[in-house]
């Protein structure tokens, strides 16, 4: 396996232009964020924030400042409503398991949309082992949740509802305020969680305005370091911690806080929000140029997800008929263009994305999908380069498929 990877890397030698569009699965951390983090490894605030000495007090001060800033960016009422976790995945695990276990006397029914991310979907299914039931609410062909079905599904036994603000694969923006209102009208005791990771830094997110009880955000989704995320839990909502260990500054997540990563997450948030409108307009313009160019140059392509204002400004998920997605990612990589297959969450099992299946895509359409996400650091030249390579790569793969009779 390692030798195969080395051969693939050798094949990339000589690439002169690189465009990183796989911002769903990881991101390039800007130098400003790296520079903000580095001193906290060995220059200052490197202590345990719970200990009574200078490095500990420095760390405590920095972490409290980050709590305050992230709570402000999310629209939380008080900083104690924020818990830092090692990632979006851990935050979603804490939200679903912690809320379900803490409130099981009120009901054992969990409701999610059928296109929730794997780290929500699998946790909801796992909770069935503990005598909880899971009901999935369908979406339409754009990936928008069926609010009437949601209304029919929620009842007095519903303890928890989880619906993303923005779907990570499709970019479709859900009507969260309306969904929360429906849930609370049917059952005021039900807890509403949203994974806001793909909304945070891209569209306005204010947890008080949305009236959600819990919300997850992720650092790397906004060009911060991997290994850090956060969970908002509204004051008064009962959530149990799901791990045991040394208690630091947080009651819901044990262990010593990772000061450098928290600082990096905070800096990335500051950069995302300081010129928010300009940043999102830039992402949208680049994305639109990319999508328009693809549809101009190629036939037999489909845009997956919603359009216009109902879509996140960075997301482009396109199905290329008669061109297998994994083959296309490799072909593009050899030209310095890095994207992901739309079936990335389950590609090791060679299964199509559950999200694309849910919106009605055929097997061949789902396996021919490519997910690309723009950032504020990309340029028009990057998009021009992609549009000069992508159509040729698609046609080359289609030619191979056609010559072998494979469909």
Q: What residue ranges belong to the model's regions?
A:
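Pyridoxal 5′-phosphate
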Residues: 1-407
């Amino acid at each position: 396996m390692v030798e195969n990877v080395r051969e693939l890397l050798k094949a990339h030698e000589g690439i002169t232009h690189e465009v990183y569009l796989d911002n769903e699965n990881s991101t390039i951390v800007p130098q400003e964020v790296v520079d903000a983090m580095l001193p906290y490894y060995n220059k200052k605030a490197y202590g345990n924030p719970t200990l009574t000495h200078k490095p500990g007090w420095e760390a405590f001060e920095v972490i409290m400042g980050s709590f305050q800033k992230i709570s402000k960016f999310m629209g939380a009422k008080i900083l104690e409503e924020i818990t830092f976790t090692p990632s979006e995945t851990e935050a979603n695990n804490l939200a679903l398991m912690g809320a379900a276990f803490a409130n099981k006397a009120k009901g054992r029914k969990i409701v999610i949309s059928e296109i929730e991310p794997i780290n929500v979907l699998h946790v909801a299914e796992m909770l069935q082992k503990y005598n909880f039931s899971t009901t999935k609410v369908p979406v339409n062909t754009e990936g928008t949740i069926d609010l009437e079905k949601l209304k029919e599904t929620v009842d007095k036994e519903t303890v928890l509802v989880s619906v993303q603000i923005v779907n990570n694969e499709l970019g479709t923006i859900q009507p969260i305020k309306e969904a929360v209102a429906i849930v609370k009208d049917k059952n005021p005791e039900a807890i509403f969680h949203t994974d806001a990771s793909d909304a945070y830094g891209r569209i306005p997110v204010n947890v008080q305005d949305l009236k959600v009880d819990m919300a997850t955000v992720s650092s790397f989704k906004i060009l911060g370091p991997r290994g850090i995320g956060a969970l908002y839990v509204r004051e008064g909502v009962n959530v149990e911690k799901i791990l045991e260990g040394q208690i630091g500054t947080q009651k819901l997540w044990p262990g010593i806080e990772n000061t450098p990563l928290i600082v990096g997450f905070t800096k990335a948030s500051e950069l995302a929000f300081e010129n928010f409108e300009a940043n999102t307009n830039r992402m949208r313009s680049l994305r639109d140029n990319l999508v328009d160019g693809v549809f101009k140059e190629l036939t037999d392509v489909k845009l997956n997800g919603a359009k216009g204002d109902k879509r996140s400004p960075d997301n482009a998920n396109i199905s290329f008929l008669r061109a297998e997605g994994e083959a296309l990612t490799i072909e593009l990589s050899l030209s310095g263009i890095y994207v992901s297959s739309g079936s990335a969450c389950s590609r090791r099992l060679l299964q199509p994305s559950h999200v694309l299946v849910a919106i009605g895509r055929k097997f061949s359409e789902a396996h021919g999908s490519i997910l690309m996400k723009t950032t504020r650091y990309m340029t028009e030249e990057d998009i021009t380069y992609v549009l000069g390579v992508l159509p040729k790569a698609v046609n080359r793969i289609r030619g191979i498929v056609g010559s072998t009779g494979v469909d």
